Amino acid sequence: MAPQPVVTGLSPKEGPPGTRVIIRGEFLGTRVQDLIGLKICGSDCLLSAEWKSPNKIIARTGPAKGKGDIIVTTLSGGVGTSTVQFRAYHETIGPLKESAVWIEESPSQNFAWGRRTLAQSGLTQEDPLGLSIEGNEQKIPEDLRDLFPEACGDLSQEHFSPAWFLLENHLATSFEDLKAGLSYLKRKVESQKEGQLSFLKSNAGSVIDQLDTLMNIRDKLQEDVKLHGNETLNILETSIENSISESQKIFTDVLVRKEKADSTRSVLFALSRHKFLFCLPNSVDRRAKAGEYDIVVNDYSRAKNLFGKTEIPIFRKVLEEVDHRILSIRKQLHEKVVKMPQSVEQQKKLIKALISLELQQSGTPIGDKLRNIDPAWDAIEARAKYLEWTFRQTFDQHTSKDSGAQEKAKNRDSSQAPNRVNFCEELCDIAASQLPDLWRLGQLYFTGELRGPHDPKPGDFKRMVLNAIEKFCVYLRLAILIATDQRALRQSSGLAWPIGSASATHQFLPWIPQCLRFTRIAYATLISLDLPSEALDIIQKLIDEVRLFCFSIIFKRATDRCKKLGSQETWELGVEEYPGATLLPAALETLLIETLDEVQSVCMQRETREGNLLEPQSDGQREVTQRLQEFLSAFSAVIEELAFHSHDEETPTHNVSQLLGFPNAQQPDSVAGSGGAAAVTWEQRMLCCLANYAYCNKIFFPRLGDIFVRYGYPLPTLAIETARYTVNQLFTNLLEEYVEHKGDPLVGTIEPSMYLGRFQWDHEMEIGQLRPYAHECCDNLVGVYSEIYSISPALLRPILESIVQTISEELARLMSCVQRFSFTGAIQAHVDIRLLRDSLEGYVNETAKNYFMEALEAINPPLSGEQKRKADEILERVKRNMRLQLLCFSVKDP
C-alpha cells in the first residue's frame, strides 16, 4: 500500500466559500482516478477538485466556516493528514455580488437605527461615531479573530462586536475623540426617535411603491375571477382528482404488462435450460473456427454430463450431431498440431484440447472412427522435422547465393558481411529459438502434462535432439572452417559449400570472430535448457574448433603484418640492452602484444562450458607452437631480407690498399647520423642486422616467452628454441658474408703491398720501423674496428677473430713461400709478424696463433740471439710509436 497523503502547503490560507485554493503536499494520488476524497474544513470539495500531479491539487472551498484541516483521501494511500489549516469566513454579500453558496435573502437589520432598511447599509455606510478615518490606517491584528471567535466588526451582522469595530477602525483614535464620537452617536439616535409622520416623510417613496403593488395585485385577482369564476379552487380540485385517476389507470396497465412479462420470462427460462444443448452443434463449430478450443472442451464435457444418459429421442439426436461435429474438430486439431511453424504454447493448447476430446469420445462408436495414437509425440516429431528442414533450407538459400555471387566478390564492400557470416547468424538464431522449443515440448511430454495413452519414448527423443544439434554443427563447420580439410565431412553429410575465389575467402576470414560470437550466443541459450552433456559436448567441440581456427587466422594475419615490418625499419639504434640493435624487434613485440590481446578477447578467453585449448599435448598447444614458429621465422626472414636486399641494391665499397692508389671508403660516424635510412651504408645495415640477430637470440626471444606466459599460455619452449636455432644459422650466414666482404679485400692487399717496389726478403734493407704492408694491415683493421664499434661493440670479437685468422693464414703462406731471408730481412719479418700478433692478441684464436707461429718458424735461417735482441728493440720502439693506433685492440669487453 502506498503512503498516506500529506498536505504540507496551501495558497491562499483563508477566504470565503468558493475560494480557489492550490493544495501542495506528498502522495496526493498517482492519477486522477486515485483521488476519491477531499475535505476542506469538513466540507466535501471533491467535485471541484482538479488533480494535477502527486504533489498538487486545485479545488474550490465549500460552505464551511472557521479553521479546519485539508484532508485528502486516495485509493492507494487511504485517508491522509494535514500540517496546514484553512480559515473559511462568510463575507457580507450585496445584491449585485456573485456568491458561491446560498445566502440569506432577508434584508439585513441596521442595528444602529433599530429597524430594517430598504437598501443595503453597506452601500451608504459611514462611520457611526462621526469621526474621520482618512488619516487612520486600518489594521486587523492576527489575533483579532482569536480574541472574538464568535463576533465581527460589521455593523449589519447580528454578532457585531463594538470592541472589534473600535480595534479595527479606530486603533489610533484618542480617548477624547472616542468620547466625542459617542456623544455624536447618542445625538444621532435621539434624532431618529420621531413620530410616525416623520417616518412617513422620510420613507414616502417606499410607501407609495407598496401601495402601487397592492393595487396591481387587486387588479390581477379581478381578472382571474372574470376568466374562471368564483370557484377557481373547485376547478383545481377537479384537475387533481383527474390526475389521480389517470395515474391509477397507468399503474394498473403497468402491473398487467409486468405479469405478462413474468409469465413470458418463466417460459423462456424453461426453454433456456435446454437451449445449451440445441445450440451446441453450431456453438462448437463457431468456437472452433475462433480457436477457442478450451470452451469447446468445456461445453462438450458439460453436455456429456447433463445429457449423456438421457433417453429422450430429440436429445439423443442432438448429441449425435454434436459427436460428429467434435469428430471433425478432432481432425482439424490434429492437422493444426503437426502444422509448423507455431509456438510451443499454441501447440500445447491444441494438444491438451485434442487429448481431452479424445478421452471424452473414447469407448464410443463415434470415437473409434478416428484414433490418434499420441498427438503430443506427433507434435514433437513434426517440430524436429521442421527444425531440420529449416536448417537445410537456410543452407541451400545461402549456398545458392554464394554460387551466384562469386563473380561479384571482387567488387564487394569490405564493410558488408559476407554471405557465410549471414548464414551463421541466421542459423544460430534458428537454433537458439527452435531447439529450446523442441526441448520444452519434450519436457512437457515426459513430465506427463501432454502424455498420451502410450508410454513415452525418451531414447527416440534424445536421438532427435542429438541429430538436430549434429546437423547444426555440420552446417556451421561447412560455413566457418573454410581453410580446413572437409573431405570427410562432405562424404559423411553429402553437403558442401561452394568453393569461392581467393578474394572471397580473404574477405571472409576477418569475420570468423563474429561467427564465433553467434555460435557462443546460441550455445549459451542451449546451456540454460539443462540439456544432457552428450548434446552440449557436440557444440562445445565445434566451438573449440572454431576458437582454434580463429586463433590460427589471427596469427596468420599477424604473420603477414610481420612480413611487412621491413618497410618500417628506420635503422634507429635505440635498444639499451644490446647496442647496435634497431627498433625493429620492439615493433615485433608491439605487434605480438596486439595479436595476443586480440586473441585473448576473441577466442582464447574461455566462456561457460568451453574447453581449455592449451592442455598439454593438445591440438591447441601444437597450433600455438606452430603459429609462433611461423611468426618468428617470418621476422627472421625480414631481417635477412633487409641485409641481403640491401646488398643487391648497393655496390659495397671495399677496403683496398692505399699503397696501390685506392683509398679506403669513408664511413659515417653513426647509422642515424646522416638523418635517414638513405644515408645508411651496406656495411652498417649488415652490422645492424647482425646485432638484431644476436639480440633476438640472447634477449628478445626469451622475453617473448615471458609475454606468452603472462597471457596465460604455457612457455612455448619449442617455438622459441626453433626460432633461436634459425636466428643462429642466419647470424652465421650473415657473419660469413660480412667477414668475406671485409676480410677478402684486406687480405688480398697484403701480398701486393709486401712486394711493392720490387721488394725482396733476401736483400739487405734498412730496418728500424714497420714495413708498409703491416702498417696498412693495422690501419685497415682499425677501420674495421671503428666501423663495428660505432654500431655494435658486441660484434667485434666474432668478426675480428675471423678476419685476424685469415690474415694470419695469409702471412703464414707468404712467409713459407720465401726461400731465404737476409740478415736484416729476417729481423724485419720477425718484427712485422710479432707486431700484428701481439697487437691483435685479444682477437687471436688458437688457429690464428698456430698460423702466426708457422709464419715465424718459416723465417729461414732462424734468428740468432743478436737478431732477436735487435728485433725486440725495434718492436718496442714501433709499439711506442703506434701505441695510440694499437690502443683500441687492447680494450677488453668494449
Curated annotation (Swiss-Prot):
Gene3D superfamilies named in the record: Immunoglobulins
Which residue stretches, if any, does this entry annotate as coiled coil?
none
Domain IPT/TIG spans what residues? Answer: 5-89
**Comp. bias intervals (Basic and acidic residues):** 398-413
A GO CC term assigned to this protein in UniProt: subapical complex
Presence of keyword Transport: yes
The record, for SUPFAM superfamilies, names: E set domains
Task: Give the matching Pfam families.
Answer: Sec5 (PF15469), TIG (PF01833)
Q: Example GO molecular function term?
A: small GTPase binding
- UniProt KW keywords: Exocytosis, Protein transport, Transport
Residues annotated as region Disordered?
398-417
Q: Which family does it belong to?
A: Belongs to the SEC5 family.
Q: How does it assemble?
A: The exocyst complex is composed of Sec3/Exoc1, Sec5/Exoc2, Sec6/Exoc3, Sec8/Exoc4, Sec10/Exoc5, Sec15/Exoc6, Exo70/Exoc7 and Exo84/Exoc8.
PANTHER family documented for this protein: EXOCYST COMPLEX COMPONENT 2, EXOCYST COMPLEX COMPONENT SEC5
UniProt function note: Component of the exocyst complex involved in the docking of exocytic vesicles with fusion sites on the plasma membrane.
Q: What is this protein called?
A: Exocyst complex component 2
Q: Lineage from the top down?
A: Eukaryota, Metazoa, Ecdysozoa, Arthropoda, Hexapoda
Gene responsible for this protein: Sec5
